[in-house]
Amino acid sequence: ESFFNSVMSVVENYPPCALHVLMNHIGTHDTARAITRLAGENPDGYGRDWQHEHNILSESDYKKGISMMKTASLIQYTLPGVPSLYYGDEAGVQGMKDPFNRTCFPWKDINAELHKWYKRLGEIRNGCKAFRRGVFVPVYSLYNTIAYKRVSEENEVLVAVNNSAETVDVPVGSEWDNSYNLFDAVSKDGYIRLAPYEYTLLSKYFQANGGSNFCPLHSQPRCLTKI
């Protein structure tokens, strides 16, 4: 609920011309690297010596951070506004606060999994008008699980994220049954079953007569090719 309260406080207080160009970021040059902040220790209140000692994540924490970065960036790229990416976050760069967050771009050590993920997020957002100009509609929020829609005159897209350690059945309505899914989880009987830390994105397109068209894979635009 607090997530939607925060988002709606922005949506309801900015005109569309400003809302759709707001900078959405999860990391900047003034903060610890996003992957470090998500999976590592909180550097607030610690000096540079401590931050230097804790600057590199363990292998298990780094793997966890990659997963958490995917979840965070999926939300970042599908909320109203423009996703703003701090250089290197898409490559898996880690580091505590300044100066540890300002290392050179790792041209020879890019995290291929995360880099590919960000490329697809960019393609999806650029190819789907609902993410660029669509109305934001909250759908569900409970126990670290959220679902929301972005709706334009051309299409409607639903984003559902389970950021908990429990399997959750998210009520979204039977109108999403048989919709096109970019991830494994689908709507069945009006519910999306999400495994722990799973997410999904469903899409449907509107017909000229006001109905909905659930496009098969071969007729989907490039932005809706499965990741």
Report residues per predicted region.
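Active-site and adjacent substrate-binding regions of carbohydrate-active enzymes
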Residues: 1-217, 221-223, 227
